[in-house]
Structures are given as structure tokens and as C-alpha cells.
Amino acid sequence: MATGKIVQIIGAVIDVEFPQDAVPKVYDALNVETGLVLEVQQQLGGGVVRCIAMGSSDGLKRGLSVTNTNNPISVPVGTKTLGRIMNVLGEPIDEQGEIGAEENWSIHRAPPSYEEQSNSTELLETGIKVIDLVCPFAKGGKVGLFGGAGVGKTVNMMELIRNIAIEHSGYSVFAGVGERTREGNDFYHEMKDSNVLDKVSLVYGQMNEPPGNRLRVALTGLTMAEKFRDEGRDVLFFVDNIYRYTLAGTEVSALLGRMPSAVGYQPTLAEEMGVLQERITSTKTGSITSVQAVYVPADDLTDPSPATTFAHLDSTVVLSRQIASLGIYPAVDPLESTSRQLDPLVVGEEHYNVARGVQTTLQRYKELKDIIAILGMDELSEEDKLVVARARKIERFLSQPFFVAEVFNGTPGKYVPLKETIRGFKGILDGEYDHIPEQAFYMAGTIDEVLEKAKKL
């Protein structure tokens, strides 16, 4: 193994000099004598390589000895990772002893070839009404949860994991990329309390970690998910938050001396996103269904980071601050959210017509809001009054109590099967529930619960 020495340290970027005949390859992992791991990013000539640190560079100094491992970063994969919390290097951070996996895989892998990839139109039921109705998920598809700060991305993500883990009993991998450590802790205990921890592998690279760590932790989680897929399983891969992956790339890019592009993002933004997203795919052996939370800076969906993510997704779930301010949770915007699966050939005529009917009614209500604000309800035609009444019921019926939020609001969570969701909304559109007061529709599960609530009002 070749050894070199540190010649320059600029924050998380470290230059190491090696003998000319033993220069490490790009992406090779290097071990500093202090125990820190570096990853080679550039070869500068003269035997010097520029690396990013996977941990804190505090306490490093020039002249320290560095050894080349001659391999990229490798992490443990397989069933031994289930129920464990690991860092970017696959080392346990839950004080439960060694992982003890039989196999280690490199975090840098080629995506499956065209021949290996498979396309599925099978729906994945989530039990969340608004998602199942308006932006249904495909098994083996990619889903983005878009939202600004504090509109409920992480809570939605936790509910999805809980529902899918309990109802579908598959394996999941959760990559916490640059999020709060408190959320990681909450998440661990939520999984433990729901008795699904033994089906989830957790990989954390939280906000306090250096950018090199946050840039690679998504790949660590993805590698573990790929192993489950290649064993013929249907695996779920959750990333919270894909924006922090981009942000880490921005920090590293500037330190590596690249010229920034629009809004200060790295010039390699699209390529970095593509490298990650192209690996999240389904093959003929198994599938990876991925749900990614995407932070939207200043609620601006045209920001380069969310805009780049859009191109890779099959379903987009857009969380809206306006809907959250009405107290309607999950705060999903049914007019902004989209899905490739919402096609009569995939979901069937009835589901498609009900979903489009719901969107049409809500859109008409949105247009009438200005008139109502100026002239009041009395100036509307009878037909429009009916549209408004039904739209307000639909808005409230799109809310739902979550299992993961039980501890905060004391309302028991609800899992609503897809056929019940369609039945409920079809009834509202057909006018079967025009006599029921709108408050009965708020925070209910199925339409039968609404009728029960209405009796007590």
C-alpha cells in the first residue's frame, strides 16, 4: 500500500502528496494516521491528489502520513444491516456492537444496463387518501415530497414508512442526509415503537457532518438498498433530504475550486443528481421504490436544485404552506401534485375520473375565491354555490389523522384503503353527502367515519 503525506488543508478539502509512481485513482479511499478517511476527487499533478474528508478535519496538520487502500469506500450490505444505525462508512453508531455483515460493497457502482431494467405499472397503496387519489405511487417508481421549511415533509415521510412497512412488510433503507439529529432520533424511536425497526436499515449523515460526508451518505444507503434488490426483494429507499445532498455538493465544489453556476450551485449539479438517481431503479430481479423529501428554498420550485430533481421523478407530492395554514394536514396541494400513474390505463376509469373530478372542483373553487372575497357567496349562481360547498368538503376530506402524529394531537391514526378513498370522493362529487356539514369531513378516515361524526354534530 502506497503512503503519502498531507501537504495542504482547506476545511474539508485536503491535498495529499504521493510518490509519482503510486498516485491514487479518483474515488480511492485514503486512511490518515489519525483514523480519518479521505476520498480522492482530483489529481493535481506532481503526485498530489485533492481529497474530501469523510469526517472532521480538526486537529490535522501538514506532514501526517496517509495510506492508500486502493479501493473506493466500501460499506456492509445484507440483512445484518437491518435494525442498525450506521454512518457514511457503514460503521455502527447505535452502540449495538459490530454489524458483522458477510459482504461489503463499494458505494460507487454503475447503474443497471438497459436490458436489466424493468418497468412496472403496479400501484403501491400508501393508505394516505390525497396521495393514493391524486398522485398514486408506482411500485419501483421514484417519488418526490416537495415543500418549504416546516410544512411536513419529514412527518409525511415517517407516516409513509410506517404504513408501508406494516401493510406491505418489505425491507426499507432510510438515508438521513444533512437533516437534524433530533429527527433521526425521533425516527429511530418511532420505528422501534411501531415494531418495524427490524425491517429498516438506517444510515445517517446529519447536519453537523462535513460536506464530504453528507455528499456520500445517500450513496451508502443506496448501496444497501441495491443489495436487497439484487437478492430479488422489493425494497423501499427513503432519502431525507435530497436538497442537502445537492447543498453538500455545492460546498465541496467551491472548495475544489470549480466555478459556480446559477444561484451559486455547482456546475456539475445535473450530473451529480443523475449519478444518484439513475441507480435508483428496478431490475428484472427486484425493485427499489424511492421516496425523497426535497426542501424547496424560499418555497420557490424553480430553484435549480428542486427543478433538477423534478426531471427524475414519476410522482411529485407538493406540500403547500397555504394548505398547512388552513390546518389541513397532510398539506398536499392536489392541484400542484402530479403522477405518471394517473392514467386510465393504469389506475382504471373510475379512479381516474374521480381524481380529475376532485381537481376540477378544487380548481373552480380557486377561481371563485376572488369573487367570494369581493362580493360574498350570495352573488354566486346556484351551480357555483354547490361547487364551493363540495370543494370545501373535499378540501377537508383530504385531511387525515396520522399514526406518527398521535402523540401530538391525541387523534388515532387512520389507514384508508384505496377503494374506500375512491368511494368517499365519488360520493361527494355525486352529491350524496350535500346534506352533511363540512366540519364532519375534517380529520376523518373513511366516509363512514364522516357519517358517524355528522350524527354527533
From Swiss-Prot:
PROSITE patterns: ATPASE_ALPHA_BETA. ATP binds at residues 147-154. Its main location: membrane. One of its GO terms (molecular function) is ATP binding. SUPFAM superfamilies: C-terminal domain of alpha and beta subunits of F1 ATP synthase (SSF47917), N-terminal domain of alpha and beta subunits of F1 ATP synthase (SSF50615), P-loop containing nucleoside triphosphate hydrolases (SSF52540). It is found in: Cell inner membrane. F-type ATPases have 2 components, CF(1) - the catalytic core - and CF(0) - the membrane proton channel. CF(1) has five subunits: alpha(3), beta(3), gamma(1), delta(1), epsilon(1). CF(0) has three main subunits: a(1), b(2) and c(9-12). The alpha and beta chains form an alternating ring which encloses part of the gamma chain. CF(1) is attached to CF(0) by a central stalk formed by the gamma and epsilon chains, while a peripheral stalk is formed by the delta and b chains. NCBIfam families: atpD. Belongs to the ATPase alpha/beta chains family. This is ATP synthase subunit beta. It comes from Pasteurella multocida (strain Pm70). The gene is atpD.
